[in-house]
């Protein structure tokens, strides 16, 4: 007798509407170069325009944030991330604050146009976070501002978009399921 086995390397299509339990709106960026910056002193959130006093980021937090954008950038070919040289103008503004509202350690807001193209986004991160918890949180929030939603924790996947987090991110490459999701969202 002869046995054969088949390995499928083509990822299946993910049904985002079923996968994400919140924060998914069917929107994405339609530009190749996306800039980001840390807010200085005060910032307003993208959608609700709530005002926050922000804390200057430490060198470690700046480096973790650069790493987070690099990790997402390595996973999606159609987008390049660049830290903005202009403190008043960036596509994504990040603020570190004391006492993020609610039970959150971070949250995001975006605005988009009638074509479901994201035009501006903000990320708020809790000041008390450090190390890999900060990195995990900023990675998750970047996933949100790229257009991905939040996933209820599951045994069959490993994703930075799981909420609450199931593990802290310590690698240098995005997890396989996250790569699959972002490539699907951006038609790669």
Predicted segments — roles?
Residues 2-61, 109-115, 173-177, 183-188:
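Disordered inhibitory propeptide/activation segment of secreted metzincin zinc metalloprotease zymogens
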Residues 59-156:
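Metzincin-family zinc-dependent endopeptidase catalytic domain
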Residues 38-42, 98, 150, 165:
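Short, small-residue-rich loop/turn micro-motifs
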Residues 119-133, 149-188:
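Metalloprotease/metallohydrolase-associated module, dominated by Zn2+-dependent proteases
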Residues 28, 70, 159-160:
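Residue-level preference for alpha-helix termini and adjacent loops
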Residues 5, 34-35, 92, 123, ...:
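A broad, low-specificity signal marking well-ordered, structured residues that form hydrophobic/aromatic
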């Amino acid at each position: 007798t002869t046995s054969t086995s088949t390995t499928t390397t083509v990822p299946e299509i993910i049904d985002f509407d079923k996968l994400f339990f919140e924060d998914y709106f069917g929107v994405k960026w339609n530009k190749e170069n996306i800039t980001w910056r840390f807010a200085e002193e005060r910032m307003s959130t993208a959608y609700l325009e709530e005002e926050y006093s922000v804390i200057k980021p430490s060198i470690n937090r700046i480096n973790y944030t650069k790493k987070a954008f690099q990790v997402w950038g390595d996973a999606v070919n159609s987008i390049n991330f660049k830290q903005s040289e202009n403190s008043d103008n960036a596509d994504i503004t990040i603020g570190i604050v004391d006492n993020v509202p609610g039970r959150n350690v971070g949250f995001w807001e975006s605005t988009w146009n009638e074509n479901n193209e994201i035009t501006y986004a903000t990320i708020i991160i809790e000041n008390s976070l450090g190390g890999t918890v900060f990195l995990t949180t900023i990675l998750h929030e970047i996933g949100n501002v790229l257009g991905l939603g939040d996933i209820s924790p599951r045994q069959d996947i490993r994703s930075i978009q799981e909420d609450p987090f199931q593990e802290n991110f310590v690698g240098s490459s995005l997890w396989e399921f996250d790569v699959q999701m972002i490539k699907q969202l951006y038609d790669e």
